[in-house]
A protein has these predicted regions:
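Hydrophobic faces of well-ordered beta-strands that scaffold small-molecule active sites
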Residues: 5-7, 74-76, 96-99, 125-129, ...
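Active-site environment of divalent metal-dependent phosphoester hydrolases
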Residues: 12-14, 82-83, 104-106, 134-135, ...
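Distinct, well-ordered alpha-helical segments
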Residues: 84-89, 108-117, 138-143, 168-184, ...
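Glycine-enriched alpha-helix->loop->beta-strand junction motifs that scaffold or abut catalytic
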Residues: 122-126, 146, 152-156, 185-189, ...
């Protein structure tokens, strides 16, 4: 059986009765329907309706299902930090905590202290930065204290790197070009460009090739489209099978794309990649960047 580290796992709600995550629609701007973050609900609702969703009380069965299909570790998506910490406590060794620090909520050193607390006390394994949430590009200097602390702690940072659908903010906040300056300024920091840089895939691949410390994941996109001519992913498939084969990680995003894990895994196994490369994409590369033996 293949082993998989899922870079974006939609965990069933209700891990902690005192804290429940909000769906993207909840954060929508008031006023015009379908505006701002609510636009995600309009675009992705049909996909989510068919996903692998399970009731909160079935969380143990959900975890057994992940093990059955070969998913040995997952990065929870869309959960507050407290919820992620509860997951890691309940299922030791099954989750990699992504410390989501919004500089809109944690100003200056407050964010730095919170990141250190999450890593040292709660066992989080990475920093998460989102231009979509903060409405700031990753190269904004207000993030630099967090990057410095992440490098000091020896943890990677995963940065939102894609076009966003929140139509109340610039569409290119997550353009891969913003990673270039960060990678130059922090050569010791392991950086993961999340969501593959779509639709600027060529630029993402070029930057991953340029910077030894820059990596990419495929979250929010189905593998069946990565291998289709004309999809815009041709360069990732070509270079991901050769020159950057050690720098690509897989995010299944089952809850977002609305397909069961078995289907999504088989789509990756069907990609025109060498068998040794498939193992790297699915497990080996993520294990290395997160320091998993």
């Amino acid at each position: 059986m293949v082993r998989i580290i899922d870079m974006e796992c939609s965990v069933p709600y209700g891990v902690n009765a005192e804290s429940k995550p909000e769906k993207p629609e909840k954060a929508a701007a008031e006023g015009q329907p379908g505006y701002g973050m609510a636009n995600y609900g309009r675009i992705f609702r049909a996909r989510r309706e068919g996903g692998d969703h399970r009731p909160a009380e079935d969380l143990d069965a959900y975890m057994k299902h992940l093990a059955t299909v070969g998913i040995v570790r997952s990065v929870p998506f869309g959960l507050p930090n407290a919820e992620t910490a509860a997951l890691m406590t309940r299922f030791p060794g099954r989750f990699i905590g992504l410390a989501r620090i919004s500089i809109n909520e944690h100003h200056g050193m407050a964010g730095v202290r919170e990141l250190e607390r999450l890593v040292r006390e709660e066992g989080f394994g990475a920093l998460g930065v989102s231009a979509l949430v903060d409405c700031l590009p990753a190269s904004d200097r207000r993030y630099y204290p967090l990057y410095t602390k992440a490098a000091e702690l020896g943890i990677p940072v995963r940065i939102y790197s894609s076009m966003n659908y929140a139509n109340d903010r610039p569409y290119d906040l997550g353009h891969p070009r913003h990673l270039d300056q960060v990678a130059m300024d922090f050569p010791e920091l392991r950086i993961i460009g999340g969501l593959g840089g779509w639709p600027w895939v060529n630029e993402m691949v070029a930057l991953v090739r340029r910077h030894p410390n820059l990596h990419v994941d495929t979250s929010a996109h189905r593998a069946r489209y990565l291998g289709q001519p004309g999809s815009g992913w041709e360069m990732l498939i070509q270079f991901g099978n050769t020159l950057i084969q050690d720098k690509v990680r897989v995010g299944l995003s089952a809850g977002l794309v609305g397909q069961p894990y078995e289907t999504l895994i088989q789509e990756y196994l069907a990609l025109p990649l060498k068998d040794t490369v498939k193992e790297k994409w699915l497990y080996g590369n993520a294990a290395r960047v997160f320091g998993i033996a």
